[in-house]
């Protein structure tokens, strides 16, 4: 996801990594070794899981709420729900572990992995080359960012170029912020970029007239326009890329077990069922991959 999931959604190298976006393409140099892939072929995800995780019996997964339908609270509660929480639960079950799901600030997710506070991050996080300097990704989703305006598109915005000279709100630390900043570098009359904590707070700036547009991940935009007639979504997606489940660079065994667990869920239909339940089945991947962003 392009997030603060934001972007997202991620100290100096980790924070820089958060701002990157990537167009999906094979990244073979970062993939598991051939021997690891061969070993995984004949073993279940639970069998691939390193002993230290089997002994703990718990899988600690972090997410950053604010990106429905990917991760959010159930209305009136602090119970995490959405695509990523449901998929995290399914992966934990394949690994025969109890899921411990935590909400955290998006820009603290990768540092949390590096410090050992979390085992995995599942938070609409785009698999980008800069982020892969800090973490490995098991890619499970593919989408891009879209421009959202008030209903009727009163500024007649048709593309990123039309944002030049206007006030735009973008989630801090997100890939969508990166998209906006790249466009701003091309603008003769610069955008005035306001940074929000997440997509919902960004939309409040549209509501109040403080901003005329935002860029959010397509599944998020789809959810908001389904729930409210106050917004309009432009059709073009920018920065289309895989989103990944992040694991620390020194946890290759866990990464491989999660890769296998995701493939098992793809094969048995459980993965697609989760995505379809939340209305994002069109962003499904055909196979689980590792470090497949550009």
Task: Give the location of each predicted region.
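C-terminal motif of bacterial Sec signal peptides marking the signal peptidase cleavage site
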Residues: 19-22
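Extracytoplasmic small-molecule ligand-binding "clamshell" domains
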Residues: 34-122
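Ligand-binding clefts/hinges and TM-proximal coupling segments of bilobed small-molecule sensing domains
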Residues: 25-31, 36-42, 48-49, 175-193, ...
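A ligand-binding cleft/hinge motif common to bilobed small-molecule-binding domains
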Residues: 125-132, 181-184, 207-239
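Periplasmic-binding protein-like
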Residues: 65, 142-149, 218, 222-263, ...
